[in-house]
């Protein structure tokens, strides 16, 4: 499923869209981890900038990337007008690399390398804005044709207003679009595949697509897919977060890190406060941060790492920011983002459960 977008080159206004069913040959596979240091905003806007060892396949599409970056910035600015405030990428994405296993299944003893990819980098922005255009365009198109889809919506950006999944094309305040379907990652998410089936019906049948689409309005199976996906996606995210936490704690041990700079972001259990490390993907509770506001920056002494429960505690050594000057506070994300953090694993053991007798484990 391809979306073709016609853009006025001078004004960057989208003047038309067309969806096609086709096979698309890949001319160049551009990877963030290999090219972000080359594809900077300066490189895209100033043709005189030349960087040593730039791949020819990248030079061949430099003009196209420059235009796409201009378009992406314009699209982002338009969404921010609808949102009412700019999007902030205060925290980076982290990449993990395990050295020493030659691509085999990890054993837990590998050397961990953690690198940073700043969100909002030019290539990242181009891809993100293209996906938003596709997902919002297809979502609105399905709604116009009366074809149900699976949407994510958010009524407002007021505190406590969460993102919801449903079958109606409703505004997504957090993104700043009239509707937002998930359709651009069918290999990664089943919901996207379902939406693409609906979009294919729209392409093939036009105004009669609602009669031919696999899922009809108020289809109980569609609601069941949403319910099942929510549970599966939460479980997937939890597993991913736990896995990243394990390797982050291994990194802390391997590098002999005993102190970290961190930022307070919310109250934790037992009178502790949760902090987020400034330079690692790590959230943990600390003692001694009582009555400190969100955004307070601290130097923290780390306790022992528990590799079974993935637990780690810290103690405040000193406050690094000026209490009377908010300009040096640490980054504070939206409340919903703060909820998606990985913490220790809770282990429940039934001491009354009788083990099955076997030659290796005879009954008493």
Map each language-model feature to its residues:
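Short, compositionally biased
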Residues: 314-322
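Electropositive polyanion-binding surfaces
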Residues: 1-296, 305-312, 327-344, 348-364
């Amino acid at each position: 499923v391809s979306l073709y977008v016609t853009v006025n080159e001078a004004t960057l206004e989208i003047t038309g869209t067309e969806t096609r069913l086709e096979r698309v040959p890949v001319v160049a596979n551009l990877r963030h981890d290999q090219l972000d240091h080359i594809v900077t905003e300066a490189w895209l806007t100033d043709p005189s900038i030349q960087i040593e060892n730039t791949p020819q396949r990248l030079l061949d599409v430099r003009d196209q990337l420059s235009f796409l970056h201009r378009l992406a910035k314009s699209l982002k600015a338009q969404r921010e007008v609808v949102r009412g405030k700019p999007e902030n990428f205060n925290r980076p994405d982290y990449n993990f690399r395990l050295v020493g296993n030659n691509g085999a299944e990890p054993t837990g003893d590998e050397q961990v390398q953690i690198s940073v990819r700043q969100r909002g980098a030019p290539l990242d922005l181009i891809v993100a804005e293209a996906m938003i255009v596709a997902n919002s365009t297809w979502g609105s198109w399905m709604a116009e044709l009366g074809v149900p889809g699976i949407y994510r919506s958010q009524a407002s950006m007021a505190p406590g207003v969460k993102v919801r999944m449903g079958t109606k094309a409703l505004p997504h305040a957090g993104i700043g679009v009239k509707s937002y379907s998930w359709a651009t990652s069918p290999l990664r998410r089943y919901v996207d595949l379902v939406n693409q089936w609906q979009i294919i019906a729209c392409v093939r049948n036009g105004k009669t697509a609602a009669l031919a689409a696999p899922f009809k309005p108020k289809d109980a199976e569609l609601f069941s897919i949403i319910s099942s996906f929510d549970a599966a996606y939460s479980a997937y995210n939890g597993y991913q977060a736990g896995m990243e936490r394990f390797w982050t704690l291994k990194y802390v041990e391997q590098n002999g890190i005993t102190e970290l700079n961190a930022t307070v972001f919310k109250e934790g259990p037992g009178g502790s406060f949760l902090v987020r490390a400034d330079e690692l993907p790590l959230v943990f509770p600390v003692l001694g941060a009582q009555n400190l506001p969100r955004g307070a920056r601290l130097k923290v002494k780390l306790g022992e790492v528990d590799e079974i429960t993935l637990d780690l505690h810290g103690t405040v050594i000193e406050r690094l920011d000026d209490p009377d000057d908010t300009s040096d506070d640490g980054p504070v994300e939206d409340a919903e983002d703060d909820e998606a953090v990985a913490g220790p694993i809770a282990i429940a053991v039934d001491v009354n459960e009788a083990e099955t007798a076997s030659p290796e484990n005879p009954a008493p």
